[in-house]
Amino acid sequence: MNKVILAIAFLLSFSCIGKSSHCHAQNKLYDEQLLKKIKPIAPTSASLGRYGDHPVDLSTGQVPIEIPLYEIKSGDLSVPIKLKYHSGGIKLNQEASWVGLGWNLDFGGSVVRTVNGFPDEKENPEVPDVEKVLEEMDNDPKGDNCYDKYNLWNKAKDYQCSFRPDLFCYNIGNLSGSFFLINDSIVTTASVPIVGCINNNTQRLVSPDGNVYIFNASETTTISSSHVKMPPYTSTYYISSIISPNGTDTIRYNYQNSGEYSTRTGTTYQGVSIINRVIIRRAPEESEWKPQQEILPIPLTGNDIYVGSVKTVKPQYIFFRGGRITFNLSERKDLATVSGNITCKKLDNIVIERKTSNKYETVKKIEFHYSYFGETLTDSDAPQKLRLCLDSITEYGKGDDELYTLRLIASFDYYGKKQLPDKNAYSVDYWGYYNGNKSSDNIPKTDLQTYKYAKVGSADRTPNEALMKYGSIKSMTYPTKGKTEFLWEINRVGLANHLYESPYVRDNCI
């Protein structure tokens, strides 16, 4: 039976469109939602029977899209393996993960690090933290130590220090959240009590239920440019073992090198020089001399190129009581490989095996089928033009009759699959989504006028609702031939009787 599921769920601001008698109540509701602090949402496991259930989060407008693939059960421990899709839109310079653009594979846990300024553990020890800097400035109102403070800010500018700690976002079990490391102690940003420590590039987190998560597999990132002196740092920590509260059950992870890829991000800049001068000119209708101000545009001086490289790892085996899971990889074309290193890989299949005696027997095999967003004529320009696209997932394994069968888990369609331009194109809006406007730089077009008129920049960064959805998922088809269609539109926010557009993609309908 063919069935199409189309459930409409508008954002809060759209509730005001309709009868005017409803506007004030909806606006009040929106104000309350706006003032609430958005907390991390614990991911939930879905079942195959609930594929079509995709409720819209009313605070973010996003949709949880998850596809369960397998669940590891080892004594008191259980780990779901599932695909998750981020429904916040696809930015033009966004790279695809090892399972396709917009998708991520959850296989047990990870800690992703956002470096604020300079890596915490590699900061200049002579530089005080931000609290000490502020205290010193408060105690020196006359500025007697200006030279020392000038040197301090110069070190911050050169990335020898930072005035904010790095942010760590974790995903373990059914919990997600974030924390900071302050004096080697974890300070969480949510009410979920997570206990942990970091030592010799290993993180140890303990969840409220007592499970211990050890992270000592990692990815390393390096960033450099003419203005940045950033040493290599650990950007992602991957789970290496999960231990039950009583210590009787353990799930272990082995990792494989999945290549090193490079990224190039260019920025252009243009300034103006505001010159105050007295023009020796008498206004014809006035008797006094008038000082005038002149604005002189400074020509573009070129791009500042930020070059980054990421050394990646991916799971090879997961060992648990009574079996193991194997992850098989193959080469991909859409990531630029660092010279002399292994080509980056994508996930080809997952093999679930049962241990009998001293041998492993295949129970099922999950295959991932890909193509690419964009088009290219040569392999040399593939890293700039292509993005890995997940088309479908199939499963080969034993059915209820103990016979091996092949079945579809899900297939996907996307908006504008062949229309996305180069990753570094300037055709983006203020938030980085594709808008189709061609430009020679990414500086927003701005008109300045005092005594003389000047223009700065040439880019039209206006959002385009039709084009910003390019690359986002359009529909998902299930084994029953049922289908869920996803309709996306620009996010809008409203206060009182005004409605404002916020130019980035969020979901409108499912």
Tell where the protein language model's regions lie, with residue ranges.
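Bacterial Sec-dependent N-terminal signal peptides
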Residues: 1-27
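Aromatic-rich beta-strand edge motifs centered on tyrosine
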Residues: 67, 81, 214-219, 230-233, ...
